[in-house]
Amino acid sequence: MKTILIIPYRDRVNHLMYFLNNSLPKLVEAIPNLEVIVVEQTHGKRFNRGATINIGYDYYKNDDYYYITQDVDVNPQIPEAINFYANEVKDNKFLGIYSDGDTLGGIVKFLGSTFSKTNGFPNDYWGWGHEDKELENRARHFNCEIEKLITFHEFDRKKKYFKIFEDNHIREECGKWHDAYANFDRHSKDVQIINIKNNGLTTLKYKIIKESILKPNVKKIKVEIL
């Protein structure tokens, strides 16, 4: 089965090159039929991690593929961490390979059919944070199984398993904390499903500005989110 690794990206060229030159060869060896798509968002708007991942999924849009979200600054260090990526994931499950305790951020694996059912990430989380909590909200709404292997706050374990670079860029915070952490659960199931259907893969609008091949199994698309 094909596995698509999606890297949301902007202005982190050193981190990207490190990942492609050091981590990717190990992942290619462990995961048959692995392809990588780097989704680079243009400037002019705050970075939108959720929408860029949605675009990476939409580019292939196959219910039967595995997908892995991969932050560009996180690199598996030891064979056990590499093997986490190769774990099989059944339908209706999200596997948090490296994620927060109550969100689906960082490195997450799922089947295309599962991501499609939850309508992916919302598209209106501009700036840093909270889109990963929204994805977990959607997973819970659809009674998806959620498994976490290593969480952000397990400091000793994450240092053992991953090499993580510091982000020295100024982070512009997303102002939708209440939507993700408080308001979602206040709504009825009927209102939740309306909100999910009206914001995600089905409402995604973007334009591909440029496509390029970085390596034989690595493609980069530069996109404008509309």
Descriptions of predicted regions:
Residues 2-4, 35, 134:
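Cell-envelope/extracellular polymer assembly enzymes that use nucleotide-activated donors
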Residues 4-12:
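A conserved hydrophobic helix/loop-capping motif in glycosyltransferases and polysaccharide synthases
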Residues 12-28:
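Short, well-formed alpha-helical segments that are part of the catalytic scaffolds
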Residues 19, 127, 133-226:
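C-terminal catalytic/acceptor-binding lobe
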Residues 31-64:
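Active-site-proximal specificity loops/subdomain of glycosyltransferases
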Residues 63-77:
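Short beta-strand-to-loop acidic/aromatic patch adjacent to the donor-nucleotide binding site
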Residues 78-100:
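Conserved donor-nucleotide/metal-binding helix-loop-beta segment in metal-dependent transferases, i.e.
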Residues 94-110, 117, 126-127:
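A recurrent flexible, glycine/aromatic-enriched loop bordering the glycosyltransferase active site
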